[in-house]
């Protein structure tokens, strides 16, 4: 199972090296890693996705807390949260495929950031499912390059799961169109 950990650390030189060294020594793999400044000066937030059962995640957490600059660790896997990734994707295009690709981009609210006779580069932001879906749809056109950030996430204060919000929106949209009761 994939787990998402949110780790607050002091913004000091070598912190990320010590964390990645710990993972390497223990034989753990990091699927996704994103690091950036947190809400407080001098503090960074690391969002990492790791594969493992609860026992492995507990073990990783204990080892991380032993590192000097680690302040707080939270496994947010089963907590309602907002998750986002950013992907830049370069796709082969020609005059006959361009409109189809632009239509897909429009549906996914992707932005065209570069366009030439032979290629198009799109910028897509969304949850990991949205990113995977557009990538899958664009495969048939010929993906040349992909650059993807790691997942970033913050817990929801409303404690409402994204899937519940999405389902509720679909039901309400259906009622507006006259399909509901």
Curated annotation (Swiss-Prot):
Pathway: Amino-acid biosynthesis; L-isoleucine biosynthesis; L-isoleucine from 2-oxobutanoate: step 1/4; Amino-acid biosynthesis; L-valine biosynthesis; L-valine from pyruvate: step 1/4. Its EC number is 2.2.1.6. It comes from the Eukaryota. One of its GO terms (biological process) is isoleucine biosynthetic process. It catalyses: 2 pyruvate + H(+) = (2S)-2-acetolactate + CO2. Gene3D superfamilies: 3.30.70.260, ACT-like. Chain A, domain 2 (3.30.70.1150). One of its GO terms (molecular function) is acetolactate synthase regulator activity. Its main location: plastid. Residues 4-78 form the ACT domain. It holds the Pfam family ALS_ss_C. InterPro entries: Acetalactate_synth_ssu, Acetolactate_synth/TF_NikR_C, Acetolactate_synth_ssu_C, ACT-like_dom_sf, ACT_dom, AHAS_ACT, AHAS_small-like_ACT. SUPFAM superfamilies: ACT-like (SSF55021). GO terms for cellular component: chloroplast; cytosol. It is found in: Plastid, Chloroplast. Keywords: Amino-acid biosynthesis, Branched-chain amino acid biosynthesis, Chloroplast, Plastid, Transferase. Belongs to the acetolactate synthase small subunit family. Dimer of large and small chains. This is Acetolactate synthase small subunit.
């Amino acid at each position: 199972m994939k787990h998402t950990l949110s780790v607050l650390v002091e913004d000091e030189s070598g912190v990320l090296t010590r964390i990645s060294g710990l993972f390497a020594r223990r034989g753990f793999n990091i699927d996704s890693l994103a690091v950036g400044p947190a809400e407080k000066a001098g503090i960074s937030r690391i969002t990492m996705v790791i594969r493992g059962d609860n026992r492995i995640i507990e073990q990783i957490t204990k080892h991380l807390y032993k590192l000097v600059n680690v302040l707080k660790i939270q496994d947010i896997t089963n907590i309602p949260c907002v998750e986002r990734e950013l992907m830049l994707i370069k796709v082969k295009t020609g005059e006959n495929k361009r409109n189809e690709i632009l239509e897909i981009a429009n549906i996914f609210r992707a932005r065209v950031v570069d366009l030439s006779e032979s290629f198009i580069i799109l910028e897509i932001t969304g949850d990991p499912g949205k990113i995977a879906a557009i990538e899958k749809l664009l495969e048939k056109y010929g993906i040349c390059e992909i650059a993807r950030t790691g997942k970033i996430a913050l817990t929801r204060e409303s404690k409402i799961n994204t899937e519940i919000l999405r389902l509720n929106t679909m039901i309400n949209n259906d009622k507006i169109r006259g399909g509901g009761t």
